[in-house]
């Protein structure tokens, strides 16, 4: 929930990250609100962020290069190993709804090296920023957190599977996709 997305399958149902409810309430309260809107003749649209993830369950050490904050196409360092928050296992959900676990290969960059405490944009070696994005900052694929790599077919499939699950469960009328220019 919000811009710091952790588990898109958790609508306030699982004990994760110190809470069950989201900041907006429980899964049942959310579904009841959608039903009430429909009964009042009001369409409902889910505000979704599929650009990045935050709050990983484990760290991974991977090769990356730093890129310039003002132009993400310019690499500013040699290849180095960075310890990054890219392993998402969702232990509180215990694979309910999806057994997909995210790892560094599902992302193309991140903004923090947990080993050194350095804040920088780290592009993962052998990864490319997305092509169909805003040209602000040279290439505005990277925004924050662990940036999803939509050139990875497994990422695309998981996002589509999640979308079908979400629509089937919530019966919302559609989505407002946030951060799509990234």
Give a label for each model feature.
Residues 22-23, 180-182:
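Acidic-and-aromatic substrate-binding clefts and catalytic sites of carbohydrate-active enzymes
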Residues 1-165, 169-170:
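Substrate-binding/active-site clefts of carbohydrate-active enzymes
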């Amino acid at each position: 929930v919000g811009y710091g997305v952790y588990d898109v399958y958790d609508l306030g149902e699982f004990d994760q990250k110190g809470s069950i409810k989201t900041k907006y309430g429980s899964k049942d309260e959310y579904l009841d609100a959608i039903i009430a809107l429909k009964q009042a003749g009001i369409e409902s649209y889910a505000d979704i962020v599929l650009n990045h993830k935050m709050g990983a369950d484990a760290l991974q050490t991977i090769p990356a290069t730093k890129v310039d904050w003002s132009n993400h196409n310019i690499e500013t360092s040699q290849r180095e190993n960075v310890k990054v928050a890219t392993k998402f296992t969702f232990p509180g959900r215990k694979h309910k709804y999806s057994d997909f676990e995210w790892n560094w290969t599902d992302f193309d960059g991140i903004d923090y090296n947990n080993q050194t405490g350095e804040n920088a944009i780290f592009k993962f070696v052998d990864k490319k920023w997305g092509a169909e994005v805003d040209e602000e900052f040279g290439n505005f694929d990277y925004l924050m957190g662990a940036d999803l790599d939509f050139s990875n077919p497994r990422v695309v499939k998981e996002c589509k599977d999640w979308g079908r699950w979400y629509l089937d469960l919530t019966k919302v009328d559609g989505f407002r996709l946030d951060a799509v220019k990234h």
